[in-house]
Amino acid sequence: MSRVAKAPVVIPAGVEVKLNGQDISIKGKNGELSRKIHNAVEVKQADNALTFAPREGFVDGWAQAGTTRALLNAMVIGVTEGFTKKLQLVGVGYRAAVKGNMVNLSLGFSHPVEHALPAGITAECPSQTEIVLKGADKQVIGQVAAELRAYRRPEPYKGKGVRYADEVVRTKEAKKK
């Protein structure tokens, strides 16, 4: 039995939940998110909470119920508070700028790197070496942050590259003669 699935997801005021078979959509002040629920999971809406239980005949019912509960909880948090992810650019000449829905990066290549942001994601640059991503969908925020980081991952000798703000880069010692 899943401990995660036993806890209900509380729906705060101002959040509207529509449950239609195995499809669910959650609407709040930061937008609307929808998701298809796994067939092994039964979701019930009672008052201002969502409860989860496995369906009969599925071996992985409790596991899927716990996963579904975590995903729907992230959706509720996303439409109420939203998610943010911070990136830092470390290195001489590494710069970032945002124009519309494009993030322009100078990462030491012979050309500037331009990355288009998906719908629902906004970016801002408090300084030339910081990028702050904001949005309602936790998965998309993480995916965009990983794509930006993949252009120039932190290298292990000097730590230069694009890193998450809370990331600790372990540096190696240089080769000795």
From Swiss-Prot:
Q: Which UniProt keywords apply?
A: Ribonucleoprotein, Ribosomal protein, RNA-binding, rRNA-binding
Q: Name one GO biological process term.
A: cytoplasmic translation
The family line of this record is: Belongs to the universal ribosomal protein uL6 family.
Subunit: Part of the 50S ribosomal subunit.
Gene, per the UniProt record: rplF
What GO CC terms are in its UniProt record?
Answer: cytosolic large ribosomal subunit
| PANTHER family listed in its UniProt record | 60S/50S RIBOSOMAL PROTEIN L6/L9, LARGE RIBOSOMAL SUBUNIT PROTEIN UL6M
Instruction: Name the source's superkingdom.
Output: Bacteria
Q: Name one GO molecular function term.
A: rRNA binding
Q: What does this protein do?
A: This protein binds to the 23S rRNA, and is important in its secondary structure. It is located near the subunit interface in the base of the L7/L12 stalk, and near the tRNA binding site of the peptidyltransferase center.
Keyword check for Ribosomal protein = yes
Q: Which organism is it from?
A: Pectobacterium atrosepticum (strain SCRI 1043 / ATCC BAA-672) (Erwinia carotovora subsp. atroseptica)
Protein name per Swiss-Prot or TrEMBL:
Large ribosomal subunit protein uL6
Gene3D superfamilies in UniProt = Ribosomal protein L6, alpha-beta domain (3.90.930.12)
Q: Which InterPro entries match?
A: Ribosomal_uL6-like, Ribosomal_uL6-like_a/b-dom_sf, Ribosomal_uL6_a/b-dom, Ribosomal_uL6_bac-type, Ribosomal_uL6_CS
Q: Which NCBIfam families match?
A: L6_bact
